[in-house]
């Protein structure tokens, strides 16, 4: 059995270590995906199947959203000048992704160049999002780090399962925040970021490592794709991964004023998995 957890960390059920992370509120949300030894997603789990431990103390789960619950998905598309040649294929891939998400999922479309722009509000109306993406134009410099930090803060204000899907060539030439500061800002919100690296940036190890760091440290998955077909496949994999999320929320019982906690999630009712 394997459990993948994220606010901005990953834990496996078959190893004994855990990572610490920083929180600013007493109600803490933990996202988890659970798979068996063959890598298949475990479905139909309930809140009493999970145990959440903070600093080795069992916590009461107060919020539970199963795999079937709706998600808030923010599509963040790089529309800077460097993406001009690839943007038409990105638009087509986004259209295919919209076919893969569940009808009840709320999807919003954002772009960034010199700053963050909202092209469509969160909605279950896919036609609105489709019309918005095909109006996007490539121009301007790249404020990648600022944009992901700003968007994660915006969508973290609402409850429920949420994620950012970032499509970019990985460059940044106009952000105020550094990569490290941006990642820390996103970590505080608990929003996972899935990154898709495409085009000429695949040949740049520095850009590849940058996007991998953004994804892994926020609980998402990094993807590298070589063509439009690969883009669509990556988007489909992201949609599947997000649909397999469980959301666990608990009220911390700690009186410790230190914001750093160690969290572990187990499935005691399934010892043979």
Predicted feature residues:
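Sec-dependent signal peptide recognition
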Residues: 2-8
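Scaffold/interface architecture of coatomer-like assemblies
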Residues: 17-273
């Amino acid at each position: 059995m394997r459990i993948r957890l994220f606010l901005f960390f990953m834990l496996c059920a078959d190893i004994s270590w855990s990572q610490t992370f920083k929180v600013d509120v007493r109600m803490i949300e933990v996202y988890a995906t659970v798979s068996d030894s063959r890598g298949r997603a475990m479905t139909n789990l309930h809140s009493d199947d999970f145990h959440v431990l903070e600093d080795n103390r069992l916590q009461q789960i107060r919020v539970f959203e199963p795999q079937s619950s709706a998600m808030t998905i923010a599509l963040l598309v790089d529309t800077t000048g460097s993406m001009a040649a690839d943007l038409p294929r990105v638009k087509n891939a986004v259209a295919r992704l919209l076919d893969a998400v569940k009808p009840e999922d709320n999807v919003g479309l954002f772009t960034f160049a010199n700053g963050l722009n909202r092209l469509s509000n969160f909605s279950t109306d896919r036609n609105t999002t489709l019309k918005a993406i095909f109006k996007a134009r490539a121009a301007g410099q790249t404020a990648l780090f600022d944009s992901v930090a700003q968007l994660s803060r915006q969508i973290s204000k609402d409850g429920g399962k949420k994620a950012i899907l970032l499509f970019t060539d990985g460059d940044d030439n106009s952000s105020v925040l550094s990569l490290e500061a941006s990642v820390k800002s996103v970590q505080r919100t608990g929003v996972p970021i899935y990154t898709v690296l495409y085009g000429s940036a695949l040949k740049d190890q520095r850009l590849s490592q940058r996007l991998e760091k953004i994804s892994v440290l926020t609980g998402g998955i990094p993807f590298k794709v070589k063509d439009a077909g690969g883009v669509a496949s990556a988007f489909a994999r992201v949609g599947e991964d997000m649909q397999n999320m469980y959301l666990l929320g608990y009220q911390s019982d700690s009186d410790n004023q230190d914001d750093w906690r160690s969290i572990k999630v187990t499935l005691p009712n399934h010892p043979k998995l």
